[in-house]
UniProtKB/Swiss-Prot annotation:
Keyword field contains Metal-binding: yes
Similarity annotation: Belongs to the NDK family.
Protein's recorded name: Nucleoside diphosphate kinase
Stored Pfam families: NDK
GO CC aspect terms: cytoplasm
InterPro entries xrefs: NDK-like_dom (IPR034907), NDK-like_dom_sf (IPR036850), Nucleoside_diP_kinase (IPR001564), Nucleoside_diP_kinase_AS (IPR023005)
Function: Major role in the synthesis of nucleoside triphosphates other than ATP. The ATP gamma phosphate is transferred to the NDP beta phosphate via a ping-pong mechanism, using a phosphorylated active-site intermediate.
EC number in record: 2.7.4.6
Cofactor(s) listed: Mg(2+)
Residues noted as binding ATP in the record, renumbered to the chain: 14, 62, 90, 96, 107
Record keyword Iron present: no
Sorted UniProt keywords: ATP-binding, Cytoplasm, Kinase, Magnesium, Metal-binding, Nucleotide metabolism, Nucleotide-binding, Phosphoprotein, Transferase
Subcellular locations according to the entry: Cytoplasm
Amino acid sequence: MADKQIERTLIILKPDAVVRGLMGEIISRFEKRGLKIVGMKMIWIDRKLAEKHYAEHKGKPFFEPLIDYITKAPSVVMVVEGRYAISVVRKMAGATDPKDAEPGSIRGDYGLDVGDAIYNVIHASDSPESAEREINLYFKPEELFEYCKAADWFYHTHARSKKEYLDSMDCLER
């Protein structure tokens, strides 16, 4: 992951995505976009973890409903890696409020705005600092994996020099 353009970000498929059977469809979107899943698991987020994750919202009127929502049923947490992964995933997720999310975005297609409740199916880290903090909340280093994808070949063929190309091929030689 030496390339500065290659980033890792945390994604949470929230309880509404899980109970509505949307996990496969949403995960597929990230894979089709060329992002690499380097860690993934299903967990039931407890209150303590939820409060750590959403600490910056403590004291805001939506904090308690948010904690209740994220702890209501299991979630799928995953780390994806790719070129500009943080901004790519945020764009794919769409606006936080589903009524403001563009059609074609994950929240635009699957999010629900029900009265004063928002079910927006997905969380995506909003910055490199948030991504690092959030990944460390949910994953141990040994739960994140390095491996080659077919798309890696494409990126390696665009090396600027033969040396750069050969140095980058270690992933493909395993």
